[in-house]
Amino acid sequence: DALLAEKQNFNTTNYFRPGSGNGGPCHPRDGVVLTWLTDKLKMESKLLTNITQVRQDQALALAKHLVSYDLPIIILGKSFKQGVDLTVGSYSILVGEYCTMLGAKIMYDDVLHQPAVVLLAHPNRKLLEKYEPAEDSVIVDLWNLGIPNAKVWGNNAT
C-alpha cells in the first residue's frame, strides 16, 4: 500500500541504473544498520545478511575481472559515494581489498604513466577527464557512461 500511495515512480533510471552492488552506495551502509536491528529484535529473517553476501560476491567477481588483465589497477573514487569523504562501507574499497587479496597492485586516484586497468567506480566522467589513462590502458565502466573503448562490466554490458 505504501508504494501504491507513493507519487514518485520507482520504475525509472533513477532507481534502475548500472553501478555498484545492491542498488547504490548508500544501501550497504543501510544494510549494516538494518542487519544490526534485525539481530537486536531477534527477527528470524536473514534477508539483509543475504543481500550483504550478494554484494560481497559481486565485489569479488568484479575484482577477479579487474585482476584478469594482469596490469596495475587504479580505482577512481574511494569514498562510499560520490561527493563525500566517508569511506566506511565503500564498494570501491571492498573491490580494492579483494584485488589486493588476489595479488594485484591497486591505487586510488593515482596517475600512472604505464598501461593499467582503470575502474570508474563513480558515475562521473570528470574523474576520467582528470585522469588521463596511458595508452593501452583498460577502462572498466560500471555505469555504462558510453566512454569510447571502455569495457562495461555487469548486467548492463553492451
How does the language model describe each region?
Residues 1-158:
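Structural/interface elements that position substrates and couple domains in central-metabolism enzymes
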